[in-house]
Amino acid sequence: MASKKKSSFVNMVVVLLLVAAIAATALASVYQVTKGPIEKAKLEKDKNAVGNVVPEFNNDPVSESDTLAFNERDQLIFYPAKMDGTLVGMAVKTYSDLGFTERIKIMVGFTIDGKIVNTTVLEHKETPGLGDKMDIKKSTWCEQFIDLNIREIEDTDGDD
Protein backbone atom coordinates (compact mmCIF):
# COMPACT_ATOMS: atom_id res chain seq x y z
CA MET A 1 0.00 0.00 0.00
CA ALA A 2 1.31 3.41 -0.96
CA SER A 3 1.97 5.84 1.80
CA LYS A 4 0.04 9.09 1.90
CA LYS A 5 2.15 12.16 1.11
CA LYS A 6 2.12 14.81 3.72
CA SER A 7 0.69 18.15 2.56
CA SER A 8 3.19 20.91 2.36
CA PHE A 9 3.08 24.44 1.09
CA VAL A 10 5.13 23.50 -1.99
CA ASN A 11 2.84 20.55 -2.83
CA MET A 12 -0.28 22.72 -2.54
CA VAL A 13 1.21 25.49 -4.70
CA VAL A 14 2.31 23.03 -7.40
CA VAL A 15 -1.11 21.34 -7.49
CA LEU A 16 -2.91 24.70 -7.57
CA LEU A 17 -0.70 25.96 -10.42
CA LEU A 18 -1.26 22.72 -12.34
CA VAL A 19 -5.05 22.93 -11.95
CA ALA A 20 -5.03 26.62 -12.93
CA ALA A 21 -2.89 25.91 -16.02
CA ILE A 22 -5.19 23.08 -17.15
CA ALA A 23 -8.29 25.24 -16.61
CA ALA A 24 -6.76 28.20 -18.46
CA THR A 25 -5.75 26.00 -21.39
CA ALA A 26 -9.23 24.48 -21.58
CA LEU A 27 -10.86 27.91 -21.44
CA ALA A 28 -8.57 29.30 -24.15
CA SER A 29 -9.25 26.30 -26.37
CA VAL A 30 -13.03 26.64 -26.03
CA TYR A 31 -12.77 30.37 -26.76
CA GLN A 32 -10.78 29.75 -29.95
CA VAL A 33 -13.25 27.11 -31.14
CA THR A 34 -16.36 29.23 -30.44
CA LYS A 35 -15.06 32.67 -31.43
CA GLY A 36 -15.84 32.27 -35.15
CA PRO A 37 -19.36 30.81 -34.79
CA ILE A 38 -20.30 33.44 -32.20
CA GLU A 39 -19.18 36.26 -34.50
CA LYS A 40 -21.05 34.68 -37.42
CA ALA A 41 -24.21 34.38 -35.30
CA LYS A 42 -23.94 38.07 -34.28
CA LEU A 43 -23.65 39.13 -37.94
CA GLU A 44 -26.65 36.97 -38.86
CA LYS A 45 -28.63 38.47 -35.99
CA ASP A 46 -27.79 41.99 -37.21
CA LYS A 47 -28.72 41.03 -40.78
CA ASN A 48 -32.11 39.68 -39.62
CA ALA A 49 -32.73 42.75 -37.47
CA VAL A 50 -32.00 45.07 -40.40
CA GLY A 51 -34.48 43.10 -42.50
CA ASN A 52 -37.14 43.57 -39.81
CA VAL A 53 -36.77 47.34 -39.40
CA VAL A 54 -36.27 48.85 -42.87
CA PRO A 55 -38.21 48.84 -46.15
CA GLU A 56 -37.51 46.05 -48.65
CA PHE A 57 -33.94 46.06 -49.99
CA ASN A 58 -31.69 43.91 -52.18
CA ASN A 59 -28.18 44.86 -51.05
CA ASP A 60 -26.14 43.57 -48.11
CA PRO A 61 -26.44 46.36 -45.51
CA VAL A 62 -24.18 44.58 -43.01
CA SER A 63 -21.22 44.57 -45.39
CA GLU A 64 -21.89 48.22 -46.30
CA SER A 65 -22.29 49.37 -42.68
CA ASP A 66 -20.53 52.39 -41.28
CA THR A 67 -19.65 53.06 -37.65
CA LEU A 68 -19.68 56.37 -35.83
CA ALA A 69 -17.62 55.91 -32.66
CA PHE A 70 -17.76 58.44 -29.85
CA ASN A 71 -15.25 56.52 -27.74
CA GLU A 72 -14.29 52.85 -27.24
CA ARG A 73 -17.65 51.90 -25.71
CA ASP A 74 -20.14 54.26 -27.36
CA GLN A 75 -20.85 53.87 -31.04
CA LEU A 76 -23.65 53.88 -33.57
CA ILE A 77 -23.65 51.53 -36.54
CA PHE A 78 -25.51 52.56 -39.70
CA TYR A 79 -26.79 49.96 -42.17
CA PRO A 80 -27.87 51.42 -45.55
CA ALA A 81 -30.81 49.59 -47.16
CA LYS A 82 -30.78 49.96 -50.94
CA MET A 83 -33.06 48.76 -53.70
CA ASP A 84 -31.20 48.45 -57.00
CA GLY A 85 -28.54 50.88 -55.76
CA THR A 86 -31.01 53.52 -54.51
CA LEU A 87 -31.13 54.22 -50.78
CA VAL A 88 -34.59 53.31 -49.43
CA GLY A 89 -33.87 53.35 -45.72
CA MET A 90 -31.33 53.21 -42.95
CA ALA A 91 -31.10 50.93 -39.94
CA VAL A 92 -29.26 52.24 -36.91
CA LYS A 93 -27.87 49.97 -34.22
CA THR A 94 -28.00 52.09 -31.12
CA TYR A 95 -28.30 51.70 -27.36
CA SER A 96 -29.86 53.01 -24.19
CA ASP A 97 -28.21 53.16 -20.80
CA LEU A 98 -31.57 53.64 -19.07
CA GLY A 99 -32.01 49.95 -18.28
CA PHE A 100 -31.88 48.75 -14.70
CA THR A 101 -29.08 46.25 -15.27
CA GLU A 102 -26.96 46.84 -18.37
CA ARG A 103 -27.01 48.62 -21.69
CA ILE A 104 -29.98 47.85 -23.95
CA LYS A 105 -29.03 47.42 -27.61
CA ILE A 106 -31.69 48.44 -30.13
CA MET A 107 -32.06 48.50 -33.93
CA VAL A 108 -34.19 51.31 -35.38
CA GLY A 109 -35.13 51.51 -39.05
CA PHE A 110 -35.88 54.73 -40.92
CA THR A 111 -37.20 55.60 -44.36
CA ILE A 112 -35.30 58.25 -46.31
CA ASP A 113 -37.93 60.86 -45.37
CA GLY A 114 -37.29 60.33 -41.63
CA LYS A 115 -40.14 58.02 -40.62
CA ILE A 116 -39.48 55.11 -38.28
CA VAL A 117 -40.32 51.85 -40.03
CA ASN A 118 -39.87 49.59 -37.02
CA THR A 119 -37.70 48.94 -33.97
CA THR A 120 -36.37 45.79 -32.37
CA VAL A 121 -34.44 45.04 -29.20
CA LEU A 122 -31.23 43.19 -29.99
CA GLU A 123 -29.90 42.55 -26.51
CA HIS A 124 -30.91 43.23 -22.92
CA LYS A 125 -30.42 41.75 -19.49
CA GLU A 126 -33.53 43.09 -17.81
CA THR A 127 -35.43 41.24 -15.10
CA PRO A 128 -37.78 38.55 -16.44
CA GLY A 129 -41.41 39.61 -16.00
CA LEU A 130 -40.55 43.29 -15.53
CA GLY A 131 -38.08 44.98 -17.84
CA ASP A 132 -38.03 42.19 -20.39
CA LYS A 133 -41.48 43.26 -21.62
CA MET A 134 -39.59 45.19 -24.28
CA ASP A 135 -39.16 41.83 -26.02
CA ILE A 136 -41.46 41.71 -29.06
CA LYS A 137 -42.65 38.24 -28.00
CA LYS A 138 -44.05 39.68 -24.75
CA SER A 139 -45.30 43.14 -25.73
CA THR A 140 -46.19 45.40 -28.65
CA TRP A 141 -44.45 48.46 -27.19
CA CYS A 142 -42.51 49.12 -30.40
CA GLU A 143 -45.69 49.75 -32.40
CA GLN A 144 -45.94 53.22 -30.85
CA PHE A 145 -42.92 54.32 -32.89
CA ILE A 146 -44.02 53.01 -36.30
CA ASP A 147 -44.54 55.89 -38.79
CA LEU A 148 -43.29 58.44 -36.25
CA ASN A 149 -41.50 61.16 -38.21
CA ILE A 150 -38.34 62.17 -36.37
CA ARG A 151 -38.33 65.53 -38.16
CA GLU A 152 -41.62 66.44 -36.46
CA ILE A 153 -40.58 65.60 -32.89
CA GLU A 154 -40.36 68.66 -30.67
CA ASP A 155 -37.39 69.23 -28.40
CA THR A 156 -39.04 69.23 -24.97
CA ASP A 157 -35.96 69.15 -22.74
CA GLY A 158 -34.65 72.57 -23.78
CA ASP A 159 -31.45 71.30 -25.43
CA ASP A 160 -30.69 72.39 -28.98
What spans do the regions from the language model cover?
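Flexible, solvent-exposed loop/hinge segments and secondary-structure transition points
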Residues: 2-160
